[in-house]
Amino acid sequence: MKNNFNELNLNSNIILGLEKQGITVPTEIQSLVIPNVLENKDIIAEAYTGSGKTLAFVAPLFQKIDTSKRESQVLILAPTHELVIQITEQIKLLAKNSEVPVTSLSIIGEASIEKQIKKIKETKPHMVVGSAGRILD
């Protein structure tokens, strides 16, 4: 297991953003997942609640996004409305704390599909997070 985020090859802005959240040492799942995401590998991982799974995939995706392009580059599917909201909140927090201008939008079943489609077209978020059912809609 890696002892710090530098060893995982995350850029300094992302590491600073994590530190602002009080996260200075990667968890086991983060140590395993982050390098593989950076290498564009497909990943299936399982870990306990509170183990840092969300940041395990979100942090390296921040590094891969070309923020100069105003287009969607990442689609994240989550099984529940609550998890969609949680992931989106973590993306927004990391964007703020790291000063990496990644934008995101959540797509959920309890909101108007027409309004959500309009919002995607208008804002062109880098990351779209949604429940599988709503994304299929």
Enumerate the predicted regions with their spans:
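Conserved pre-motif I regulatory segment
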Residues: M1-E46
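Short hydrophobic/aromatic-rich motifs at helix boundaries and adjacent loops
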Residues: F5-N6, N13-I15, V33, F62-I65, ...
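Generic alpha-helical segment signature
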Residues: E7, N11, T54, V84, ...
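Conserved nucleic-acid-binding Ia/Ib motif block in the N-terminal RecA-like helicase ATPase lobe
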Residues: L16-K20, R70-D137
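Proline-centered helix-kink/hinge sites
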Residues: P26-E28, P35-N36, P60, A78-H81, ...
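Walker A/P-loop NTP-binding motif
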Residues: S31-I43, K53-K69, I85, E89-A95, ...
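The conserved Walker
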Residues: A47-S51
